[in-house]
Regions:
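Residues within HEAT/ARM-like alpha-solenoid scaffolds
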Residues: 88-92, 181, 185-189, 208-209, ...
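Conserved phosphate/anionic-ligand binding catalytic regions in large, soluble enzymes, centered on
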Residues: 203-213
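Active-site-adjacent structural elements in folded domains
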Residues: 174-183, 194-201, 265-277, 281-290, ...
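N-terminal transition regions in large eukaryotic proteins
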Residues: 1-194, 395-439
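Amphipathic alpha-helical interaction motifs in eukaryotic regulatory proteins
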Residues: 75, 79, 94, 98, ...
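Extended, Lys/Glu/Leu-rich amphipathic alpha-helical scaffolds
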Residues: 227-281, 313-407
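Aromatic-anchored, charged helix-turn/loop surface patch used as a conserved interaction hotspot
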Residues: 105-152, 231-286
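Long, repeat-rich segments with strong aromatic
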Residues: 282-338, 423-427
Length: 439
């Protein structure tokens, strides 16, 4: 009894708590329905799950249960020592438990490159995802990644620690050793950063690509600001998932990212909502892909959204996949990304279309249409940033970018009638020139 009282006292002292009446936790219903109605599980797994559910019930007193403990114990159901429930069954178990709680998120996603035998602890899951994130970044953009490690602008850099500096100077035997040190250092730092930014939302690791987002937030903003941004994102995401019966799809991600943008930069957020005639669709995995193509220069006064939308005009299709959706629907195919379709990178997204043998879609046209759709958005945001940025380097970069956009795109954005008019004027001028000077 004293043990239980001590346990519950710790719960009261824990700031990371969730009230049961808000999210409607009903452990007994979960246990009864789970065991009696939905799944046939062998005796060993049954005993393990029963013990886990019993442990969860110990934490429940006075309508309070720590959210991190709840999800931590649920994870044990699907990552049992000595055995592993298949990914499919794990999703079924999670889906059932969440459904019993009155939540219906359809996004039960596991780390993409961790197979069943590898998953035996939370740290293993994080380390594998972090390793994948770091290695992917190096493979995709090795030059920029090397520059980041020496970027003195980044506060709290992973190389600000004296021990890391000493270690990095010692390992100089060959380029391979140096690269391995960079990878290992970033993996370890990213693991620490991820856990810190997750805070109470440890289970958020199961959201596809979280570590990859963390990596670039850490690189761009440094530890202190990066943790603040990622904590904000985790909180907003959690509020949506646990308080509303959302279908976790493009609309869901759009709402979450818009909320984040609204908090960070209300002007940009209002421009997005005002200018785009149809809802732009954001996919976090596309954002990740874009950041792996990151440019050399990242200035302090440029927000992440500024950096995202202004670095390269050629990547503008990331902002509004609704044109792709529209094209896809024109041929009578319903477009819907489910939890089982892990579109980690844009190439896989297009590959998915190709696998379906959808040859009627003109991808170049889609990208160009998206560029045109967002052209005004760029101009307004860039103009706004130019008038509000004090750093001359940042201002000069945006002004140069603004000019380059029009230099490259102005004729393409003209209507057919306008182009014909310009062509006719050019012909008339040539005719006049011929009459006057040739004869």
């Amino acid at each position: 009894m004293k043990e239980k009282e001590s346990l519950n006292q710790n719960i009261y002292d824990n700031n990371n708590i969730v009230y049961v009446d808000k999210f409607n936790y009903d452990i007994q219903t979960i246990e009864n329905n789970y065991i009696k109605e939905h799944y046939k599980i062998d005796k060993i797994k049954y005993d393990k799950i029963e013990k886990i559910l019993e442990k969860i019930k110990l934490y429940k007193k006075n309508n309070i249960i720590p959210d991190n403990i709840f999800w931590k114990e649920l994870r044990k159901i699907s990552t049992q020592p000595g055995g592993f429930i298949s990914i499919k069954n794990r999703r079924e178990i999670y889906s059932f438990i969440l459904d019993t709680l009155g939540k219906k998120p359809e996004f039960i996603i596991t780390p993409s490159n961790v197979n069943e035998k590898q998953v035996n602890s939370y740290d293993t899951i994080i380390k594998n995802d972090c390793k994948r994130s770091v290695l992917h970044s190096i493979i995709r953009n090795n030059d920029n990644f090397q520059k980041y490690q020496n970027n003195k602008k980044i506060n709290d850099s992973v190389y600000s620690n004296d021990s890391n500096d000493t270690q990095s100077t010692q390992v100089t035997q060959n380029e391979s050793d140096e690269n391995q040190l960079i990878v290992d250092t970033y993996i370890n730092e990213l693991m620490s950063f991820t856990k810190e930014s997750l805070g109470n939302y440890e289970y958020f690791n199961y959201f596809q690509g979280y570590q990859e987002i963390c990596l670039y937030f850490m690189i761009i903003f440094g530890r202190k600001e990066g943790v603040r941004y990622m904590t904000l994102f985790g909180k907003i995401y959690l509020d949506y998932v646990l308080s509303k019966n959302y279908k976790i799809n493009f609309d869901m991600l759009l709402d979450i990212l818009n909320d984040c943008c609204n908090i960070v930069n209300k002007k940009v957020n209002s421009l997005i909502n005002k200018i785009t005639k149809t809802k732009p669709y954001y996919s976090l995995s596309w954002l990740i892909t874009y950041l792996t193509h990151s440019n050399d220069n990242i200035y302090n006064e440029l927000s992440l959204l500024d950096y995202f939308i202004t670095s390269n005009i050629g990547h503008m299709y990331f902002l509004s996949a609704n044109i792709i959706v529209s094209e896809f629907n024109k041929i009578g195919t319903k477009f819907n990304i489910t939890a089982d379709e892990e579109f980690t990178y844009m190439e896989l997204f297009f590959q998915h279309f190709q696998n379906l043998k959808v040859s009627v879609i003109d991808y170049e046209k889609i990208i160009k249409d998206n560029e045109k759709l967002n052209h005004r958005l760029f101009n307004d945001i860039i103009s706004y940033r130019i008038t509000n940025i004090t750093n001359e380097n940042d201002k000069g970069t945006l002004m140069l970018l603004n000019r380059n956009i029009y230099d490259n795109e102005i004729f393409d954005n003209l209507s057919i009638k306008t182009k014909l008019l310009y062509f006719l004027i050019a012909v008339i001028l040539l005719f006049i020139f011929y009459k006057i000077f040739v004869k």
